[in-house]
Amino acid sequence: MLLRFPQPYDFELSTGRFRDYRSDRATVWHDGALYRVVAGQEVRVSAADGGVEIEPWGEAAAGEIGRLLGLPFDLETFRGGVSDPTLRSIVESLPGLRPTLNPQPFEALVVAITTQQISLHAAASIRGNLVERYGVRHEHAWEFPTRERIRELRPRHFTPLGFSRAKAEYVLELAHSDLEFDALALVDDEEVIAAVTSVRGLGRWTADWFLARHLARPHAWPAGDLGVRKAVSRFYAAGGSLSIEEVRRMSERFAPFENLSAQFLLAGARMAG
């Protein structure tokens, strides 16, 4: 059944990161389609006129896939409101791009932990090992390990998967924490940051990306992310290297669309090579 998207929407362009990181086992690109397990059932997502085709259809599948593919973003208002000429040029060059999200909060934070201080490809690889070992396999994709499943583990279970001792402990701290994910969706950005950073191993960078890539908060600006710093430096510092604080101050330039601005700057940097 068709899940409609505001047009223009380019499925191939918007899902490029899933093809780039094929070691991701929770959201799998295979033979022109995405596969993800939703509520215990594998769902196939493919391009269709006016949106995407979801098989099998269900309310849970439509909700999760819509969030995965960035439906919460108000791109029409963003595209019409971009005033910065450099960013506007990037946005106009990518008319069908809709940034993606991670629809599950626990998974989103584990993803953030795995990407700390290593390349995205290396992070995807060790995360894939975790999902294969402790998730539930379906035909193409694996169901991401639940918080309850991770609580059963010890640091020694993570070492063969490529995790450092510290990252293993951070994932376990998260699993055993008092964070109430549903409640985080209902509070303001500063409260989310305070709650996330109260867990050992989760700092401001992790909180910013959680706001940006899970909650789709419009003002999220992950200045501490190396990719964002490189993208901002590329387009606004003539290839020089801006500091975290310099990048953080630049968020005012893109208000009130900081999150989508960061996503499009990253996309522009990737497209430019």
Show which residues each predicted segment covers.
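HhH-family (HhH-GPD) DNA N-glycosylase catalytic core used in base-excision repair
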Residues: 1-273
